[in-house]
Amino acid sequence: MKPQLWDSAAGSALPFWSAEQLQEAWESRHDLKEVADGCRLNVLSAIQHAGSGHIGTSFSSMDIFIAVRKFLQGDRFLTGDSLEQIFFSSKGHDAPALYASLHSGGELSDAQLFSLRRLGGLPGHPETVTPGVVTNTGSLGMGISKAKGFAKAQRLRDPSSRQPVVVLLGDGELNEGQVWESMPGAVKEGLGEVIAIVDSNGIQSDTWTHHTLPMGDVVARASAVGWHAVECAGNDPDEVLSALEEARGDSRPSFIVARTTKGSGISWMEAFPENGAYYQFHSGALAVPLYDQAASELINRFGGGSPNEGVTSAEPVLVLDPYSPKARPTSMVSIWENMLVDVMEKNPLVVALDGDLSYDTGTHIAREKFPDRYIQSGIAEQDMVSMAGTLALSGFIPLVHSFATFLTMRATEQIFNNASEESRVIYLGFLAGLIPSAAGFSHQAVTDVGIMSSIPGMRVFEPSGAEEFHWCIEQAISHPGPSYIRVGAVAPVVSGREGIHRVNRVIEGGATALVSSGPLLTQQAIESCTVLENRGFPVPAVYSVPEITNPFEAWEIDELRQYERVIVLENHNSARAKHFQLSSQLASNDLNIHRLGLDGLPANGQPAEVLEHHHLDAQSIAEAVARLAGEGFLPTAKIESDSETYTHRESH
């Protein structure tokens, strides 16, 4: 049987198995493992087409998805019937595996499968806009609580209902306290229909779970609070199916620890030494030679072929180093990873805390150089923040690292408590703002400015480049109270400026000033000047403002008074930032102040299409400048002013 081919944007054809081919294979051999391997090829190609996604955990959990589908559908397995019972993945990283399982049953089309991480397509983490997805996930720890709610709702509608509610968790997710908070209540309520499966592949974002945050005997812990708790071989779908059937026959809620291998299905993805520091296949599309090798192995295995038939070597065609991080282009994170080392060398009171994101937040170099002043907290943001609070009370300067959305929303109460002690804790929130957008809104921090600016004494920063980053960390260390630094995931704006202030002019301009914070919108503002110049329009001035929340000083107000209008660009949805401050401080003046920013939930997709969707790309900013100046030229941007909101769209 030959796979189908999907044309990628790069011009290459990506192999995949259609739902009909998967159904044909099942009807011929009734081999769940074969169906799972067929879905692995679809996961691999969908991620390759998207350019990003989580391969390792999708491969480790693929057998579980297929086993659960068989458990819930029985004889209707892969018949195209909708999955009526409730099953969802709490960890969310395995969304490609979820989509592949839905596609295998005909619930998602081929085109939908290859719309992964595109605007209007399949979200990077599960959302209810997708057929077959019953709840939004991606923020860890909520799964069992959500499953309890579904089970209780079923009973309220039909007191005799005991339809299984199955939730898949990650073993790293077990770091989150909510998982363990949720378990006793399921026993108290007698919710025997709740079945939790743990994809226990042993590896978190960078390395082994027992090196990150050892969780002990989780089977014994679940059993101790009254759950039916068992283990099984998670990459054997028949064993998983047997464990599910055993759970169905037990009156207690069930906790199944499925022992899996991260990257299961590809020999060299499975190989990771005990002392390995960086698992190479946690996220991201593969280099083309690796993709071709992995696809060949999966294609030849499907239909009863030899696992390595047609594959020249069981070793990867490219050398992969499990002891070194992946190379990455210059970014705000790469700037910080060296700056953090410098800060810790100069100040022995600085302590770095990390939430299982040492590579993604740039703490990995400091971890090796200063192991005594590096604390790996795992995926336990509330614990990390409270620990930082008492470190600060004891005279140290804790620097708390996590993704901005998890840090600021999960640990808000702990952050507030620390602030009430007027202690100096510095929070660094990564992936801040609209971009990266492919992972979906669970990972896009657009509420963080509103949250952190409401904390008493909190200073909020967002540097646009290396010079401003140095200024921000100096300001934060000298500030006696708490500080929050948003760290964008895009390339820094290179300015070459030596003197950094709270308001920095990047480009000289005419009657309009664009004011922004951070690299994303500062760069779009700079590029909008090129768009305007190429069209013969006056170029606006561009200002970068690295501190978001403090009111403007008198000289800064005077600086902006020279312009006829000011447009504030905001990479968040807070009403408490620069547009609000300017509107308040200049209310008695005739200065026209406008805002281009976010409202509501951010869109999911590739960066360029998401920026355009929110009218925050260079073209939209240029059109807003021209429109407000009365110059016309096909306006499409949504512009907020003090008095009203204008929505301009191109007409034909």
Residue ranges and their predicted role:
Residues 167-168, 196-198, 352-354, 400, ...:
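Structural beta-sheet core signal
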Residues 1-166, 302-482, 486, 491-492, ...:
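Thiamine diphosphate
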